[in-house]
């Protein structure tokens, strides 16, 4: 009798949590990973999937995307599962006033596992787009996070155009009170230099859009600015958050060459970023692969590293007993044009190919199957009763 409901054989398995990077088989028992071994007999799988020539990895974890609170936000399933994302973090779309509605209408209805960073503004990204200082309440924000820690994993501060540090200071305080982290999206201003902003963050806090042209990590001398290097030494994290106007090869390429990779790879996906820059997880991963980042590192920063940051180490791994969230990617070996975004162009990186998603499993169930890897061939007789009147 087969041991596993599903057996994925012959793929190149990458699991950063366990140091796995090679040809392995993955057995799935119900909703959980059952085994990751070098050669599991095909007889042990009720259904066997041939993943030869493909990469098998934990389901992708997108730390920064938008499925509520803004024009262009999307319902998670159709914009995550086709690109290998099984877990996403809504990045500040809701605040403490609006979270319950978001949870009812999006989180609970989505097949994708949805977490959220709670906006420091009570209304979230609705209305005046995060400018209302009076609605930035650290205690109410922290209380909601503590109340709904099953979904809420941190605090988001973004887009504040005022002169002072109120938004960031209150966001950091809310994170401190809730025992979580604060993620900041903030442009530099003469009254608010980026170097000082980084000093206001604590170890475990971070900033997104780290390679945005309007937040230049590279100075006029072509070097990574010293305050970024010092911040990383203090434990500040840096997220990609590609978006429609927040990723530049002119920033990312020299930063990588100088040993300053992102901690996490994410999309900042919304309608505009998808249409203008194709900001899907597989496409953003392809850009880092094309810039020379090894595949194992690309996968780690798209799975295990974001899972650790949000405090859910049961995810982003293929450890036996972990949820069977699994993504199967293939490198499409043909010339590809990979676009950046925003004020630097946009510009195109000519690459040898790109990653495409072949299959997405969520809790052991196939949710997306691009080439029908888990389906029977048409030569197999359908089971429908053809004698019906």
Task: Indicate where each model-derived feature is located.
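Histidine-rich, glycine-flanked metal-binding segment
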Residues: 1-57
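C-terminal cap of metal-dependent C-N hydrolases
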Residues: 11, 323-380
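Divalent metal-coordination and catalytic microenvironments
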Residues: 11, 26, 31, 53, ...
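Di-metal (Zn2+ and/or Mg2+/Mn2+) metal-binding site signature of metallo-dependent hydrolases
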Residues: 54-77
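Alpha-helix-loop-beta-strand connector modules within alpha/beta enzyme cores
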Residues: 57, 106-117, 174-178, 231
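Divalent-metal coordination cores built from histidine and acidic residues
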Residues: 78-159
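Active-site core of metal-dependent hydrolases
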Residues: 154-275
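His/Asp/Glu-enriched, well-ordered alpha-helical/loop segment
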Residues: 250-335
């Amino acid at each position: 009798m087969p041991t596993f409901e599903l057996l994925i054989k012959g793929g190149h398995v990458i699991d950063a949590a366990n140091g796995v990077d090679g040809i392995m088989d993955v057995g799935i028992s119900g909703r959980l990973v059952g085994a990751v071994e070098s050669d599991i007999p095909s007889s042990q799988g009720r259904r066997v999937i041939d993943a030869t020539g493909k990469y098998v990895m934990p389901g992708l974890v997108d730390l920064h995307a938008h499925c509520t609170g803004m024009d262009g936000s999307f319902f998670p399933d159709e914009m995550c599962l086709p690109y290998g994302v099984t877990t996403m973090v809504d990045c500040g779309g809701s605040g403490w006033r609006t979270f319950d509605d978001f949870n009812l209408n999006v989180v609970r209805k989505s097949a994708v596992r949805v977490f959220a960073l709670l906006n420091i503004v009570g209304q979230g990204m609705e209305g005046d787009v995060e400018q209302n200082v009076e609605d930035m309440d650290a205690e109410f924000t922290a209380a909601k996070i503590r109340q709904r820690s099953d979904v809420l994993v941190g605090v988001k501060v973004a887009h504040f155009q005022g002169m002072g540090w109120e938004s960031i200071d209150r966001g950091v305080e809310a994170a401190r009170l809730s025992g979580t982290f604060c993620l900041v999206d903030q442009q530099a201003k003469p009254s608010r230099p980026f170097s000082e902003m980084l000093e206001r963050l604590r170890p475990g806090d971070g900033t997104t859009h780290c390679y945005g042209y309007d937040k230049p990590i590279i100075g006029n001398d072509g070097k990574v600015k010293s305050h970024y290097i010092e911040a990383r030494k203090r434990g500040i994290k840096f997220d990609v958050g590609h978006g429609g106007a927040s990723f530049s090869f002119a920033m990312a390429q020299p930063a990588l060459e100088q040993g300053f990779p992102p901690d996490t790879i994410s999309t900042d996906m919304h309608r505009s970023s998808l249409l203008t820059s194709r900001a899907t997880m597989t496409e953003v991963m392809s850009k880092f692969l094309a810039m020379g980042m090894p595949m194992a590192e690309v996968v780690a920063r798209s799975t295990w590293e974001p899972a650790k940051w949000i405090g859910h180490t049961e995810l982003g791994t293929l450890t036996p007993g972990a949820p069977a969230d699994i993504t199967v990617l293939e490198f499409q070996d043909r010339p590809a044009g990979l676009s950046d975004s925003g004020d630097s162009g946009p510009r195109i990186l000519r690459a040898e190919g790109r990653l495409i998603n072949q299959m997405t499993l969520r809790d052991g169930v196939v949710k997306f199957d691009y080439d029908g890897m888990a389906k029977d061939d048409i030569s197999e007789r359908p089971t429908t009763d053809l004698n019906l009147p």
